[in-house]
Amino acid sequence: MKSIVLASSRGIGKGIADELESISSEVIRTSSSDLDTSDIDNVKDFVSKNKETDILVLNTAGPPAKDFYEIREDEWLKYYNQLFYSFVYILQNIKVKDGGYIFLMTSFNIKEPDPKLIMSNCYRLAFTSILKSLTKDFAKRAVSCINIAPGPIDTDRLRNLVDDVDELGKTLPMGRVGSTVEIGRFVKSIIENDIKYLTGVTINFDGGHSNYVI
């Protein structure tokens, strides 16, 4: 079984790739140095070398926190590629084999938008819509599509967004932020237990932090 895990040199991607090592015969990991999803030529080169897989984990770093009126045109275009079009191209050109899985890593902010993370909110939500739209076609080949929407997880990105992760954790329902290992184990458990009927869903992974119902 082959797995491709994007942005897996650290953070959530690494947590997933580390767990998949024990159940996958081949795990292809990428970092920003060998796959920059904001560079479509780089994405095309990667895809040309990776035509198919059993497990595809679509994951990428997020944009900086910025006020809407301060976001430049070049930033809109960069993160359009990084968060949206790169995934479109990958999904169009890397075949996920029958019985496989597609995991999309987004954010709980797609349902509860953060005004400082507008680029992340809108582009992640747009691709979530694409994956949902394709779910029924993928289901015909027993390919399950699962969107995981993490809340505060202990990653470099979170540490760049907040001043004190430990203090943030104290304000959360569980008294802590989540760990990348937890997400990795969750993904592994779905694959390892051959859970197929769970598809076309967005799963909150936020320790009860979000306020929305569905």
Report the location of each language-model feature.
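Catalytic loop of short-chain dehydrogenase/reductase
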Residues: Y101-K140, P152-I153
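Conserved NAD(P)H cofactor-binding loop of Rossmann-fold oxidoreductase domains
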Residues: V57-A65, G208
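N-terminal Rossmann NAD(P)H-binding glycine-rich loop of SDR-like oxidoreductase domains
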Residues: S9, G13, A17
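Short C-terminal tail/terminal secondary-structure segment
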Residues: K188, T199-I214
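Short, small/polar-rich loop/turn modules that mediate ligand/substrate recognition or access, typified
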Residues: A139, S144, L198-G200
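A glycine/serine/threonine-rich, flexible loop-to-helix segment
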Residues: K140, N147-T171, V213-I214
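Catalytic Tyr-X3-Lys loop
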Residues: G62, Y69-Y89, F103, S120, ...
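A conserved structural motif in NAD(P)-dependent oxidoreductases
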Residues: L172-I183
